[in-house]
A protein has these predicted regions:
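A charge-rich, low-complexity, intrinsically flexible signal that marks solvent-exposed coils, linkers
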Residues: 1-130
């Protein structure tokens, strides 16, 4: 079943104007890298996997999904996962303030550079060969 996230072959969405590859930044705004890092870090901690993360983004309302930027959809998916996993309450999300500490087992985890380097999805370069 196709949804709003799978527009391959669909008409009526206008032309696509990608940025030239030689000047396209990895992240367009400072917060995008943080969202990406949080999603990946919490995945490394075993709270969810890449399929669960994608599913959270794909469940966004179609209007929001199409209106949002790529990393705005990642942020919305992250918020959904944090709430559904019980790590945050809706009140905490809305106010942007934690009402208490994170679970002890998460506070005690330390993510080392070697943990990140040895993760299959980040072994590759994010830069394109030119």
């Amino acid at each position: 079943m196709n949804s709003v996230h799978d527009l391959g072959g669909s008409e009526g969405f206008g032309s696509i104007h990608p940025e030239p590859e030689d000047i396209e930044p990895i992240f367009h705004n400072w917060w995008e890298g943080r969202v990406y890092a949080l999603v990946r870090m919490l995945g490394l901690f075993g709270l969810w996997n890449i399929d669960m993360s994608r599913h959270a983004r794909e469940r966004l309302h179609p209007v929001d999904y199409l209106r949002n930027s790529y990393y705005e959809n990642w942020l919305a998916g992250l918020e959904t996962q944090l709430f559904e996993s019980g790590l945050v309450t809706m009140e905490e999300l809305l106010e942007g303030i934690a009402k208490g500490p994170a679970p002890k087992e998460l506070r005690e985890r330390v993510l080392l550079p070697s943990d990140v380097k040895n993760t299959p999805l980040v072994r590759m370069s994010y830069f394109r060969d030119t």
